[in-house]
C-alpha cells in the first residue's frame, strides 16, 4: 500500500459536520485495511484568496496508508460532497507521523500565552505580598 497526504477544506457553514465527515472517511480507510498515521483538524482558517465568494474554510489534514481503490473512493466522495470546497490528495514516499507546522505553531502560541499568564500571575502575587 502507498502513503498519501490528504487535505480537504469544508465550507465554513458546514463546520459542525466535520467530525462526522472525518469519522466516515477514517472508517472508509480502516475498513479497507488502511492505516491513518496522522489526523489533524486545523479548524476554520482564512483562505489565501476567495473561493466561491468564501474567505474562510475548515481545514482537515490526513496522512494515510491505503490501497488505490480507497483513495479513488475518497476522491469521488470529496467531489460529490457539496460541503467540501477543495481537496488535494498527494502521494508521499513514507508515512508522516510528526505534527505539521500548523499544529506546531499553534502549540507554540498556546505555550507562550500560558507562560505570559503565569508571569502576570506571579507579578500580581508579588504585588499582593508586598502590601
From Swiss-Prot:
Pfam families given in the database record: Ribosomal_S6
Keyword Ribosomal protein: yes
Region (Disordered): 100-131
The keyword Ribosomal protein is assigned to this record: yes
InterPro entries, A to Z: Ribosomal_bS6, Ribosomal_bS6_CS, Ribosomal_bS6_sf, Ribosomal_S6_plastid/chlpt, Transl_elong_EF1B/ribsomal_bS6
MF terms in GO: small ribosomal subunit rRNA binding; structural constituent of ribosome
Source organism superkingdom: Bacteria
SUPFAM superfamilies, sorted: Ribosomal protein S6 (SSF54995)
GO biological process: translation
Acidic residues bias (residue ranges): 119-131
Leader sequence segment: none
Annotated keywords: Ribonucleoprotein, Ribosomal protein, RNA-binding, rRNA-binding
Entry GO terms, CC: cytosolic small ribosomal subunit
Coiled coil: none
Compositional bias segments (type: Basic and acidic residues): 104-115
PANTHER family: MITOCHONDRIAL 28S RIBOSOMAL PROTEIN S6, SMALL RIBOSOMAL SUBUNIT PROTEIN BS6M
Function text: Binds together with bS18 to 16S ribosomal RNA.
UniProt record similarity statement: Belongs to the bacterial ribosomal protein bS6 family.
Protein name, as recorded: Small ribosomal subunit protein bS6
Species: Photorhabdus laumondii subsp. laumondii (strain DSM 15139 / CIP 105565 / TT01) (Photorhabdus luminescens subsp. laumondii)
Gene designation per UniProt: rpsF
